[in-house]
């Protein structure tokens, strides 16, 4: 508006220019995250975690799927199709309010199958310890991270950053990665189309990532 006013002679100066340096963009919050060369040690420590198998597997699944912690914690068994190797998260539970389909690697399927033996009769995949009618607490996964010695070095949300970094470095399709992380697509039609189009590619990508983590864990 001010630029137009200057051009048309309605103003002599654009005050917005003077504010350009004063207005700072909000800083993006960075969560502690693992580097590629730290993954092997972390996974070995996680494997030795003496606590709940369900919580340990939840931590691994967070790493293997790239989902947000809240999306994983509130997972219900009706969303998981182990035969097809697909986890369908309804839009109501997604940050972007769009349904999200997560292809499962063979390792992720095995973890869900192990958990099903423990919690499969209930509604939630990861029920609360004291109340199975509620989901696992928000602090559960970060408590696992703390107990295995990685407090301040890793977080549940940080696993998404680690996955994104490694997959980009390996040259995987950026659209596959962004779709898997359920990042926003400003074009809703394109976003819906891409979601279906990239399913096979994302399955291939997540299988590679699961195999990669397995190799690092073995050392």
What annotation goes with each model-predicted range?
Residues 33-40, 84, 93, 103-153, ...:
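Active-site/catalytic core of tyrosine-dependent DNA strand-transfer enzymes
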Residues 7-75, 83, 94-98, 118-119, ...:
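Basic, Lys/Arg- and aromatic-enriched nucleic-acid-binding interface segment
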Residues 1-5, 115, 167, 213:
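Hydrophobic recognition helices of helix-based DNA-binding modules
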Residues 25-26, 33, 88-97, 109, ...:
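Catalytic-site neighborhood detector that most strongly recognizes the C-terminal catalytic loop/helix
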Residues 60-71, 139-140, 147, 158-184:
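C-terminal catalytic core of tyrosine-transesterase DNA break-rejoin enzymes
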Residues 78-86, 151-153, 172-194, 215-219:
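Short, polar N-cap/turn motifs at the start of nucleic acid-interacting alpha helices
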């Amino acid at each position: 508006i001010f630029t137009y006013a200057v051009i048309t002679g309605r103003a002599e100066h654009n005050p917005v220019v003077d504010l350009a340096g004063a207005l700072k963009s909000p800083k993006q919050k960075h969560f502690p995250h693992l580097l590629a060369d730290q993954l092997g040690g972390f996974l070995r420590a996680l494997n030795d975690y003496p606590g709940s198998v369900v919580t340990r597997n939840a931590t691994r699944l967070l790493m293997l799927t790239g989902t947000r912690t809240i999306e994983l914690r509130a997972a219900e068994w009706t969303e998981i199709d182990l035969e097809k190797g697909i986890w369908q998260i309804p839009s109501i539970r997604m940050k972007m309010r769009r349904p999200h389909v997560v292809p499962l690697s063979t390792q992720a399927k095995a973890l869900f199958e192990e958990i099903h033996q423990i919690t499969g009769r209930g509604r939630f995949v990861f029920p609360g310890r004291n109340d199975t009618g509620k989901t696992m607490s928000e602090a559960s996964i970060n408590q696992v991270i703390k107990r295995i010695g990685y407090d301040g070095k890793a977080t549940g949300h940080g696993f998404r950053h680690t996955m994104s970094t490694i997959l980009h470095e390996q040259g995987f399709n950026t659209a596959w990665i962004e779709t898997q992380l359920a990042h926003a697509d400003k074009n809703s039609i394109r976003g819906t189309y891409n979601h279906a189009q990239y399913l096979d590619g994302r399955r291939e990508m997540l299988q590679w990532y699961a195999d990669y983590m397995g190799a690092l864990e073995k050392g």
